[in-house]
A protein has these predicted regions:
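Conserved "HGTGT" condensation-loop signature of ketosynthase/thiolase-family condensing enzymes
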Residues: 1-76, 83-171
Length: 172
């Protein structure tokens, strides 16, 4: 377990990593590299939203971006002229859900659904949760990527995002 102070520090450091990536992303909504202390400290511009999260630790509700993913066969992609460098090959997938009523859940320190999905993903990559070229641990709040890093067995120095995350990169 962690003390609240330790958990806040880990969240600030993780979100600082996300902001560093977003600062270099030309498509990011908030291109600024924040250090962990700036993310953790409540200020007029970084007010407390819901304990323990300040504004710089939650989804940015002022962003209105969209994206699309088209899934097709390799032959069809070639016919459409999609360059190989823009293709992503899916080797599998997984889905699960938690009870929508969080009061029904048996605990709050981990997610059974997340563990099931990430366990399936780890199996798909041969049992090594660190075997990814790139990963995006996207979430409204730091707690979900923190749990995912633990489930995947990531060290703190593993890059958890390629976009900059929901706070800094943005989303619909």
């Amino acid at each position: 377990g962690q003390t609240p102070r330790e958990a806040l520090r880990e969240s600030g450091e993780l979100w600082s990593t996300f902001s560093s990536v977003a600062a270099k992303n030309p498509h990011a909504w908030l291109k600024r590299d924040f250090d962990a202390d700036a993310i953790m400290k409540p200020t007029a511009d970084n007010r407390l939203i819901a304990w323990p999260y300040n504004k710089l630790m939650v989804a940015n509700n002022m962003v209105n971006q969209g994206a699309a993913l088209i899934i097709t066969s390799l032959a069809r992609a070639h016919e459409a002229g999609v360059p190989e460098s823009r293709m992503v090959c899916f080797v599998g997938g997984a889905a699960a859900e938690e009870p929508r009523d969080y009061l029904v859940r048996d605990q709050f320190v981990e997610s059974h659904a997340q563990n099931a999905v990430l366990g399936t993903v780890i199996d798909l990559v041969g049992g090594d949760g660190t075997a990814f070229d790139a990963i995006e641990l996207y979430s409204c709040f730091p707690c979900v990527p923190k749990m995912a890093r633990r489930t995947l067995g990531f060290r703190a120095d593993v890059q958890p995002t390629v976009t900059g995350g929901l706070t800094f990169f943005g989303a619909p």
